[in-house]
Amino acid sequence: MAKPNILAVDLGYSSVKCAYYNESDVLQLEKFISCTAKVDSPLESDDDSLFQLGTSYYVLGTPALKVPRSQQIKLNSWEGLLEIYPVWISFLLKRYGGKEKFTKVAIGLSLAFKDKADELLDKLEKTLMIPKDYFIILPQGLIAKKIYYEYGLNINEASKKNNTKVQNVLIVDGGFLTLDICNVINGTASSSATIGIENSGVICISYKLVEYIFKQYGISISIKEAQVIVDNDGAWKRRGRIYDLSTQVKQFTLEYLVDVLNLLENKFGEALDGLDAVLIVGGIAYFFKKYMSELTPEIEKHFPLSFIQIPEIESEFYNAFGFLKAAYELVG
């Protein structure tokens, strides 16, 4: 019997992460910025970046940042994510060889939206005309546990047998909009020990930057534009003028990371007393790693620096890879 072929998609408010095995059974990872713009009609000059779904036309990824803000789909709520989901799934299936190539598509939801699974499946089925059972929905954050216990802090195949893993760990999966936090005891997590918190992700940095730019320069920018400025360490170019917002980006990022540490203390303080580590995955891991030296005094108010574990590489792919591995186990 032929091995199933599964595509795993972690569609987030900041980026889209994909994982699958190619014809040589080698893991493939790919990432796109999730910016999505819906345009009224196709323009000849846009042919390379346009994607059509039904009678609608979209610009996806980095090219969408150049489209007027009024045409960009707002990605700061569940409704925005729901709107772009079928567009990206359709695009990715086409990109990777078509629906018939894959046995299943594994997708995930933040625990903050765990009651939205049926709504998402209804949307995908109605828009794409694909049966609901073609999709497998898995929990973000919680699924990262699978990769951690198999691969530790490095998802390279050669590094599977490392000794960085601990049995009692708080997993913090920080995305753009949400934080998913999972308390793992003796290698096991229960649904009662996991939470998802909306509007607690790195979008908090972007909110502050949007407010600062408007107050300082009288210029309105979108949350997605602010995200790009943060990703570019504060470099911002508008109408030929270059702005240096590196000081503000650093300040807002450090303030946000301190808030995350305080949130962990407030919600999991007693649990932390009996744990061996905090594992930080997702996009937030990049910021913790980048600002670790400046953040050390704040971290040590709660626990020693060694208490924090961060993947060596590809921290943003722990969910997508976890979806892939879990889906293969479910399909058999």
For the regions a language model picked out, list residue spans one by one.
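Nucleotide/phosphate-binding catalytic cleft detector across ATP-hydrolyzing
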Residues: 1-169, 188-202, 227, 236-241, ...
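Aromatic-anchored, glycine/proline-accented short structural segments
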Residues: 175-234
